[in-house]
Curated annotation (Swiss-Prot):
Domain Sm: 27-99
Function per UniProt: Component of LSm protein complexes, which are involved in RNA processing and may function in a chaperone-like manner, facilitating the efficient association of RNA processing factors with their substrates. Component of the cytoplasmic LSM1-LSM7 complex, which is thought to be involved in mRNA degradation by activating the decapping step in the 5'-to-3' mRNA decay pathway. Component of the nuclear LSM2-LSM8 complex, which is involved in splicing of nuclear mRNAs.
Classification lineage: Eukaryota, Fungi, Dikarya, Basidiomycota, Agaricomycotina
Record's GO cellular component terms: nucleolus; P-body; sno(s)RNA-containing ribonucleoprotein complex; spliceosomal complex; U4/U6 x U5 tri-snRNP complex; U6 snRNP
UniProt protein name: U6 snRNA-associated Sm-like protein LSm6
Family according to the record: Belongs to the snRNP Sm proteins family. SmF/LSm6 subfamily.
A single MF term (Gene Ontology): RNA binding
Gene3D superfamilies according to UniProt: 2.30.30.100
Subcellular location field: Cytoplasm; Nucleus
Source organism: Laccaria bicolor (strain S238N-H82 / ATCC MYA-4686)
């Protein structure tokens, strides 16, 4: 019996499945309600990130964070016990850990 490998085929390998994408179907309001009390990243329009526990927010996107770290270009530049961010400066809010 011949144990040599089969000859190469001219067929290309099957395509890889696409990477998994977020499958959250809830509304932005549902997301924001779900991250209250959890660690979040708040990106400002200036490019500065604030990371901390989302204490509360209002309809204007005014945000209160606890145990807050300020990140500029990925480097921690300040730490605050509490931070209050005016909503018109907020570019986005993301969960710092899977929800």
């Amino acid at each position: 019996m011949d144990n040599s490998p089969p000859p190469p085929s001219n067929e290309s390998p099957p395509p890889q499945p696409p990477p998994p994408q977020a499958t959250h179907t809830g509304s932005p309001t549902d997301f924001l309600k779900g991250v209250v009390g959890k660690r979040v990243i708040v990106r400002l329009t200036s490019g500065v990130d604030y990371r901390g526990l989302l204490s509360c927010l209002d309809g204007y996107m005014n945000i209160a964070l606890e145990q807050t770290e300020e990140h500029v270009n990925g480097v921690v530049t300040n730490r605050y016990g509490d931070a209050f961010i005016r909503g018109n400066n907020v570019l986005y809010i993301s969960a710092a850990e899977p929800i």
